[in-house]
Amino acid sequence: MCAALGDGHGGEAFYRWFAERSSAEQVTRDIESIPAAQTRMDQWEAQILARVMHKAECIFVTGEENRELIETMHMRWAPNVDAALCMAKERLGADASVTVIPDGVGVIVREGEA
């Protein structure tokens, strides 16, 4: 992911879902234990991000001033796209593919489609 985070991390409750837990797996376990009628603030955003983090390692490209925030949320920080691609290639190998999603809110990604 790439973002300047000019407005910070978004909702405080969203941030706390990750900052107060040891992993994305713990976020998922805690969310799954909440009855549907007792859904908490920003729960759905945390649930979606945790689901993504189960499937993929999230590398977040943003300024150094946001590094601690990103790492507290259990993602890897990178200072630029080149560094993020190097991290991904180290983990997945030189033949790994990259998916570019220009607008995360306006794009639906389906696995196995190009």
Which stretches of residues belong to each language-model region?
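C-terminal non-catalytic interaction/assembly regions of soluble proteins
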Residues: 1-114
